[in-house]
A protein has these predicted regions:
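His/Asp/Glu-enriched short active-site or ligand-binding loop at hydrolase and phosphoryl-transfer sites
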Residues: 9-22
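Active-site and substrate-binding clefts of carbohydrate-active enzymes
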Residues: 27-204
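A conserved hydrophobic secondary-structure block that centers on an alpha-helix together
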Residues: 1-6
Length: 204
């Protein structure tokens, strides 16, 4: 939607760096942003761009929340029970040297991360409104297996984020994509480029 190259050079993404992403060539800047929804020009289909900053914060093992050393290590299991008793410790720590998992430390970190995330979203929307005079949209979408599977504490994180928005930042509305389009119908139509998911098709 914005143009350019949102991924950068070839790099590994995903909660545990298990997905290689090969970016497409750079495209000229479009003048559009991901703070709005848009119609496609040839169909009554609305599109929203995932906010890179907000999404990367939750998805990235390298720079986001899931890679924190106190969170439970996914790859090391006890040989007999199959249970996970260890924490990530650090990205470079060998599996055999992982420290034992402490659920209290992990829960404290979830509280810290959810505080940071709700504040981040609030300031992103507030800064956008100050700059443009318009209400903005921050769209985030994730594979559901991220929460509770790859990132064991992810379910609690989502729970706390929703609770904190409801309690402390009720002015930040949470809604589904369909609810947003219904209450804020797009005003512009854009042509989106083909990607590996839409190539040769019509995106709907």
């Amino acid at each position: 939607i914005e143009g350019g190259n949102s991924i950068g050079n070839r790099r590994v993404i995903g909660v545990y760096g298990n997905i290689e992403y090969i970016p497409l060539p750079d495209r000229p800047a479009t003048g559009y942003d991901t703070y709005s929804a848009y119609w496609l020009p040839d169909a009554q289909v609305a599109v929203m761009g995932r906010n890179e900053r907000a999404g990367y914060q939750v998805w990235s093992a390298a720079d986001g929340y899931p890679g924190d050393g106190v969170y439970r290590e996914f790859h090391r299991k006890d040989a007999k029970s199959g249970m996970h008793y260890w924490r990530i410790t650090s990205p470079k720590t060998d599996l055999g040297d992982k420290m034992l998992y402490d659920p209290v430390l992990a829960l404290n970190k979830v509280n810290e991360n959810s505080d940071h995330y709700t504040t981040l979203i609030y300031h992103m929307l507030n800064d956008y409104k100050k700059a443009t005079g318009k209400e903005g949209l921050v769209m985030v979408s994730f594979d559901t297996e991220l929460f509770g599977h790859w990132w064991f504490e992810g379910v609690e994180f989502i729970k706390q984020v929703i609770k904190k928005f409801n309690t402390y930042l009720p002015e930040v509305e949470r809604m589904t994509a369909g609810e947003y389009v219904h209450s804020h119908p797009p005003k512009e139509a854009i042509q989106i480029p083909e990607s590996s998911w839409g190539q040769g098709g019509h995106f709907y």
